Amino acid sequence: MPDPAKSAPAPKKGSKKAVTKVQKKDGKKRKRSRKESYSVYVYKVLKQVHPDTGISSKAMGIMNSFVNDIFERIAGEASRLAHYNKRSTITSREIQTAVRLLLPGELAKHAVSEGTKAVTKYTSSK
């Protein structure tokens, strides 16, 4: 059994920023692989909508899978649209059309308006 004094402390759940070094048997240190996730952003949105509500790690995992799934669907559809129109670049127009095709009714309208707002904010900040 490894000596607990030599091993690095476990990083906090949900926090994927810090790359801690792990002690190997031969004394050399190696970096732990980073796990990318949307947990920080999901948490920020949760606090904007419901400041007094928390989220379990299991629920965060589900939300992370959901965001990854939606991202892949939109990217795939946008890629197809660009290919159909003989374009090599995915622009905000392809993303917007992909969102309209993938999301139902009112949800698509809200997503498009929020996306347009985000792009406008980004463009004006440049």
UniProtKB/Swiss-Prot annotation:
Q: Where in the cell is it found?
A: Nucleus; Chromosome
Give the span(s) annotated as Disordered.
1-36
Name any one Pfam family assigned in the record.
Histone
Which residues constitute the cross-link Glycyl lysine isopeptide (Lys-Gly) (interchain with G-Cter in ubiquitin)? Answer: 35, 121
* N-acetylproline: residues bearing it: 2
Respond yes or no to whether keyword Ubl conjugation is given for this record: yes
List every position bearing N6,N6,N6-trimethyllysine: 86
**At which residues is N6-malonyllysine found?**
117
Q: Does the keyword Membrane apply?
A: no
Write down which residues bear the modification named N6,N6-dimethyllysine.
58
Residues that the record marks as modified (N6-succinyllysine) are: 35, 117, 121
Residues carrying ADP-ribosylserine: 7
Per the record, residues carrying N6-acetyllysine are 6, 12-13, 16-17, 21, 24, 86
Residue numbers carrying Dimethylated arginine? 80
Give this protein's Gene Ontology molecular function annotations: DNA binding; protein heterodimerization activity; structural constituent of chromatin
The modified positions for N6-(2-hydroxyisobutyryl)lysine read 6, 13, 21, 24-25, 35, 44, 47, 58, 86, 109, 117, 121
Q: InterPro entries under this entry?
A: Histone-fold (IPR009072), Histone_H2A/H2B/H3 (IPR007125), Histone_H2B (IPR000558), HISTONE_H2B_site (IPR055333)
Q: Which residues carry this modification: N6-methyllysine?
A: 47, 109
Q: Modified after translation how? A: Monoubiquitination at Lys-35 (H2BK34Ub) by the MSL1/MSL2 dimer is required for histone H3 'Lys-4' (H3K4me) and 'Lys-79' (H3K79me) methylation and transcription activation at specific gene loci, such as HOXA9 and MEIS1 loci. Similarly, monoubiquitination at Lys-121 (H2BK120Ub) by the RNF20/40 complex gives a specific tag for epigenetic transcriptional activation and is also prerequisite for histone H3 'Lys-4' and 'Lys-79' methylation. It also functions cooperatively with the FACT dimer to stimulate elongation by RNA polymerase II.
Omega-N-methylarginine-modified residues are where?
A: 87, 93
Function as written in the Swiss-Prot or TrEMBL entry: Core component of nucleosome. Nucleosomes wrap and compact DNA into chromatin, limiting DNA accessibility to the cellular machineries which require DNA as a template. Histones thereby play a central role in transcription regulation, DNA repair, DNA replication and chromosomal stability. DNA accessibility is regulated via a complex set of post-translational modifications of histones, also called histone code, and nucleosome remodeling.
| UniProt family annotation | Belongs to the histone H2B family.
* Subunit-structure text: The nucleosome is a histone octamer containing two molecules each of H2A, H2B, H3 and H4 assembled in one H3-H4 heterotetramer and two H2A-H2B heterodimers. The octamer wraps approximately 147 bp of DNA.
- Quote the protein name from its UniProt record: Histone H2B type 2-F
